[in-house]
Amino acid sequence: MKKTTIASSAVASQKQTQSKLGNTSSKITEQQTTHDPALSRSFRGHEDIITCADFDPKMRQVASCSKDSIVYVWNFKPQQRPFKFVGHKGAVYCVKYSPDGETIASCGQDRQIRLWQNTVQSKCSIIKAHCGAIRSMSFSADGGYLLSSSDDKTLKLWRLQDKKFMCSFAGHKNWVRSGVISPDMRLVASGSDDKTVMLWDLNFQKIVSKYSTLDDNVKISQINSYSDHMDTVSQVLFHPDGTCLISSSFDHKIKITDIRSNKLIQHYNAHDAQVNSISIHPTGYFLASAGSDSKIKIWDLRQGRQIYTLYSNDKDITTVQFNQSGDYFATGGSQNLCMVWKTNFDQNIQNIEQVQRSTVRQNDVEYSSGGLYAQTLFKTNKTASLSPSKKTISIIPPQQLQDTFNNRGDDELNNGRVHENKQSNSPTFSQQQQQQQLNLSENQYPGLEIVGNQFNLQQSTLSNNNNQNNLIKSQNDSIVSNKNAIPFHPSSEFQQSAVQQQFSQQPKLVVNNGTATYPSNFVPKVEEENIMTEAIAASMQQIYSRLDTMFQYMTNLENRVVQSEQLQKSFVSQNHQNTLDPKQQTMNFGYSNIQDHSLSASLNDRNVVNIFQAGALANTGSIEASLINKQQEE
């Protein structure tokens, strides 16, 4: 009896179960927990290592290929027998279904691509594609093109309608293990034994228009090259949204790169041996990986962590592949068995989608989106602006959340990280409430006005637009803060309870079409203004005092400079006198001393003026330091 242990993480209640698999049986003999992956079917027929497996898009079959040079097609209906395609000479490395499920493509050691009709009595079309073994293939999203990767260090694009060669991608310095076409059919990614991942630009519109009238060759260009891996790149994949590139390597690692910013955003030390294959769930939430350490691992890309580990008696697990709906995934390896697993992710995905569609209120604190509390999306810092008269500070009122979502930057990626959003200029409150001001007493905050306040929203992993109005309401429920305001943190029970107590006595806001308004009987309380506002008021008052002192001193300096210049002119006029009596000479001698002192004072005063000008450009602290030093010198 072969034994497979399925170890799940805390997401699956941290339970471990075991299932015993017979050599030819396709049933599970031991009950497993509800949300754990479970073996559904196993197919035996190959005589050598299984190298690749793929699902029929209509979920009628699963195809597998092997080093025994045979392609098997396994039917899920028990009454239908499997059939096999024979024709390759040597190992078959890859098998793929076309998007419509009517064609099966296979390639291998014999340097050929074979296109099979998905019937028992199949006709085969042969494309002599490369000068070396063909390692992998990828269909375009519309099924019209096929990309092949080869040991001849190139990738080639083929038009399936007439089996015609379109273009070649040359740039790698070693075998090309994997190539894939992006979902929007504009990019091609490739991974090679030269430890690099390359990204290529490809415009399919040029293929069918401009270049098809010439020689059907496509002008391509290499966009970028990534060399983060330390060993052979075994496979590359595009994320379903087309913004990220996922690569696996023999260096035991899996890396996810944002192709818009060319930045590495996730990195996993995935296996204890080389990673042979990866597959992305259609939702983009989960990633499956297979390695030579006898393990299959499932990763939650939203949380950035491993959630399942499946142990197998296969020394090398060479392939893993999700089906089109994400309900199943297939694996194969050195035991020559093609295994089909039920993911049981549907319940987890339903829970996620249900939370995204609705919000739950507890003590006037709303939370939503995958268990992330809504209050963790808010920061208690304020955004302030100084009035033209420099006598008031206005705390900008809350902005409309819809524009915040629409104006977010391209560097934001729904991968579990928190990003700052761009500010919106569209107000959420009505015009009457925008004009509402909280007039503070002159003794407490001299010359200061406070208008509203604002919480700056940071976006977490929110993709469903249905919960935006709920977040607007959650944001505006927290519009009035107090002196005991604390920073939000999702992992602190104490802070959560304090937040709930803080907001429990605050007024409800009425939300209508994304616009939040105060109740008619509500009057904001001045004494509950945030302590941060007090700090702003005190700081600005100190700045005003320092500026007044600085201006007075600069005025005195200018007067002294004028007096010194007048004394200097008077002394020069006296020197032009031709005859002087002894008494006048004594007077001139006195003027000379005064002139020397005045020149020195004039130079010093001008230096002080320059110092003040430089200090004013730097900061108020430097100005104050210059004032104190000059007063001490005098």
Swiss-Prot record:
Localization (cell): Cytoplasm, Cytoskeleton, Cilium basal body
InterPro entries, alphabetized: G-protein_beta_WD-40_rep, WD40/YVTN_repeat-like_dom_sf, WD40_repeat_CS, WD40_repeat_dom_sf, WD40_rpt
Main location: cytoplasm
PROSITE patterns in the record: WD_REPEATS_1, WD_REPEATS_2, WD_REPEATS_REGION
Gene Ontology process terms (BP): cell projection organization; centrosome cycle
Gene Ontology annotations for the cellular component aspect, listed alphabetically: ciliary basal body; cytoplasm
Keywords: Cell projection, Cilium, Cilium biogenesis/degradation, Cytoplasm, Cytoskeleton, Repeat, WD repeat
Protein family per UniProt: Belongs to the POC1 family.
Name by which UniProt lists this protein: POC1 centriolar protein homolog
Pfam families recorded: WD40 (PF00400)
Regions of compositional bias (Polar residues) in chain numbering: 1-35, 397-407
